Amino acid sequence: MSTITNQIIEQLKSMTLLEAAELVSQIEETFGVDASAPAAGAVMVAAAAPSAPVVEEQTEFTVMINDVPSAKRIAVIKVVRALTGLGLKEAKDMIESVPKAIKEGIGKDEAQQIKQQLEEAGATVTVK
């Protein structure tokens, strides 16, 4: 390439997106061309290339009790009752049949708070 071409390329590399858009519109006006026509071919090439999968952020979480040590059962039952509104027998049955979902379809902050309360009581907990 000639030195003039290299200089132009280097100047184009240093331009901001706003400056580049302004340059394109000035070239269109000056030379009477339409820069959008070649973009259609580029779109078809881009469409043929495999796209990266879109990763969605999880918005609903489930708090699971995985294990409750025997020495901590009473404390965990109290926390489960407070969180779920279950009776004593239902809460006891729930922690005896671990792994078990305590709360489902809740927000991230609430799930983290519940996890912290259950872990402080002695349970092994995961948030899914």
UniProtKB/Swiss-Prot annotation:
Keywords: Chloroplast, Plastid, Ribonucleoprotein, Ribosomal protein. It comes from the Eukaryota. One of its GO terms (molecular function) is structural constituent of ribosome. Pfam families: Ribosomal_L12 (PF00542), Ribosomal_L12_N (PF16320). InterPro entries: Ribosomal_bL12, Ribosomal_bL12_C, Ribosomal_bL12_C/ClpS-like, Ribosomal_bL12_oligo, Ribosomal_bL12_oligo_N_sf. GO terms for cellular component: chloroplast; cytosolic large ribosomal subunit. GO terms for biological process: translation. CDD domains: Ribosomal_L7_L12 (cd00387). It is found in: Plastid, Chloroplast. Its main location: plastid. Forms part of the ribosomal stalk which helps the ribosome interact with GTP-bound translation factors. Is thus essential for accurate translation. Homodimer. Part of the ribosomal stalk of the 50S ribosomal subunit. Forms a multimeric L10(L12)X complex, where L10 forms an elongated spine to which 2 to 4 L12 dimers bind in a sequential fashion. Binds GTP-bound translation factors. Belongs to the bacterial ribosomal protein bL12 family. This is Large ribosomal subunit protein bL12c.
